[in-house]
Amino acid sequence: MNQPAADMYYSQHMSAGQAPPPQTVTSGAMSYHSQHPPLQPTHMPQYAPQPQYSQYGYANGLTSPQSAQPASQMGQNVLPLPGVATQGFQGFDTTGQVAPPGMKPRVTATLWEDEGSLCFQVEARGICVARREDNHMINGTKLLNVAGMTRGRRDGILKSEKVRHVVKIGPMHLKGVWIPFERALDFANKEKITELLYPLFVHNIGALLYHPTNQTRTNQVMAAAERRKQEQNQMRGAPQTGAPGLPSIQQHHHHMSLPGPQQSLPSHAQMGRPSLDRAHTFPTPPTSASSVMGGNMNASDSGFQWAQGQGMGSAQGANPMSIDTGLSNARSMPATPASTPPGTTIQNMQSYQSGAQQYDNSRPMYNPSAQQSPYQATNPASQDRPVYGQPDPYAKNDMGPPTTRPATSGAPQDQKPANGIIHADQSGGQPAGDEEAEHDHDAEYTHDSGAYDASRASYNYSAPAVGNLPAEHQHLSPEMTGSPSHPPASGRATPRTAAAPQPYYSQQAGYNTPPRVPQQPSSNLYNVMSNDRGTAAGAGTGDVYQPQADMGSMSNGYASQMNGAGGIKRGRDEDDDLQRPSSGGGMDLKRRKTLLDSQVPAMAYAPPVMAQQPRRR
């Protein structure tokens, strides 16, 4: 390993599958400590009578080709019994080299990206003890944990180590105090856990990975590790190369891992890894599988294919895609081969936020200010954020609420519907007409819109009234629908893009809660079904007044009354409620307590006397 001599010696032993005898340790010591080798000849004869250990040759764990020659060279006497070895060498137990009877070497290897080294891992007693490939240091903390040592004693021992490397960040099994190989072997021998940890101390532990029956898998692992190293170096060298950088890396992976012509996706699928890593970006739209990996990963290419995959005109597709590859570089994903390629997944991810494209709501995310430009690599967080629908810092800042609406931009107390009605984004029960009118005003701001602020109307409802919504793919990003350039499909502008209030806001400038469309019967019925007011006293829900939100839809500001049965009690209600006709919340709370006891269908005629009352007060 470190010295060619040691390499030669150990590789022979390893491959022979014989537990290297005590002298292996000495020779190991030779390689590390440069001790004298004379022990080898002296001890060899002692162990001659135990040839049966060659049965345990464990050639399975080691490179088979060499297995024949070392045995012949060294003779059978190289095979010590573990017990004898312990007696022969106090402090230098070679059981680390010898497989205990019946035990198969179980080694896994992972790439420790922070340190740039491959780590071999052996698990014992549920604890994973790691050893680095480059300098063979071993995680002493985990090693002593396997020994069952108390924390205080363990830390004391490790603090007194002269050569140690403390790791405080990273995966759990890699944190701890790393100590040199020889010291770790010492500790393991003292604590009698060397056999338990086999093959952690086998000098040529890498050979155990190259298991003959497992050769292809092992090669894949090692090749992947190599690829990652190279990739990391590339990415560090040119962190934000933009679109051109992607193809090179992408093709680099294809060529390294696969023989034969590298087509866009098929080869990618065979690689096996990208599918995994792509999953941890975000669900890509259904067609992304065939189109995300454009042939050469050119920005326009992949965009073009993606757009066609979505059934959109190529004219729209080719243009906006320039964003994608830049974006994927900009976001802070680990630069593993598979997480880089879905360059378009980022744009797919953004496309999620614009479900009902015709409202153009996600357009300002790209237009308004320099920091939001998706090309900018400095704020990957805010580029990823719209994807997940979290409240977007700039989405809120840039959209001024329409002038007629009270300043609700950040005020959930306004959003909370006056009567506690569950909105369509919560229950989905409201009729379509209601949804549109109501959500165009307040769904962006509703009290539960923490998850929706960034994506706004796109998630909150799918307005059935819009003609081309069914035809268009729900997940298209605003650029792809061309929303910046052509008028919104629905024919109306969003609050953020319109200078003047929308026509349907202007009539109701006086209301503090979002007005409703005149869809009274269904609205009333909805209250009956899902409002928490009606059930307090088994009361009917045909309230004297609709919640303030509903009043906008009625000509005179109150709902039609129920049939005369409730007349007297309702009169009292009005006296209480109407003192503050503008505060919807107060009305509802009182009304909830004092509703009628009879469940009656809504929509009866309103006595004229009642009708005058709101105006008197």
Curated annotation (Swiss-Prot):
Keyword flag Membrane: no
Ranges of Basic and acidic residues composition bias in the record: 438-447
DNA-binding region: 140-161
Record keyword Nucleus present: yes
Ranges for region Disordered: 1-79, 223-274, 300-451, 463-617
InterPro entries assigned to the protein according to its UniProt record, in alphabetical order: EFG1/Phd1/StuA, HTH_APSES_sf, KilA/APSES_HTH, Tscrpt_reg_HTH_APSES-type
Molecular-function GO terms, alphabetical: DNA-binding transcription factor activity; sequence-specific DNA binding
Gene3D superfamilies: Transcription regulator HTH, APSES-type DNA-binding domain
GO BP, sorted A to Z: conidium formation; positive regulation of transcription by RNA polymerase II; sporulation resulting in formation of a cellular spore
Compositionally biased tracts (Low complexity): 45-58, 305-318, 334-345, 488-509, 599-617
GO terms under cellular component: nucleus
Domain HTH APSES-type: 106-212
Annotated segments matching region Nuclear localization domain: 569-593
Gene disruption phenotype: Impairs conidiation and ability of their appressoria to form a penetration peg, leading to unability to infect unwounded Granny Smith apples or onion.
Major location (coarse): nucleus
Keywords on record: Conidiation, DNA-binding, Nucleus, Sporulation, Transcription, Transcription regulation
Family label: Belongs to the EFG1/PHD1/stuA family.
Function: Transcription factor that regulates asexual reproduction. Binds the StuA-response elements (StRE) with the consensus sequence 5'-(A/T)CGCG(T/A)N(A/C)-3' at the promoters of target genes. Required for the formation of aerial hyphae, efficient conidiation, and the formation of perithecia. Essential for the generation of normal turgor pressure within the appressorium. Required for infection of intact apple fruit and penetration of onion epidermal cells.
Name of this chain's protein: Cell pattern formation-associated protein STUA
Name of the gene: STUA
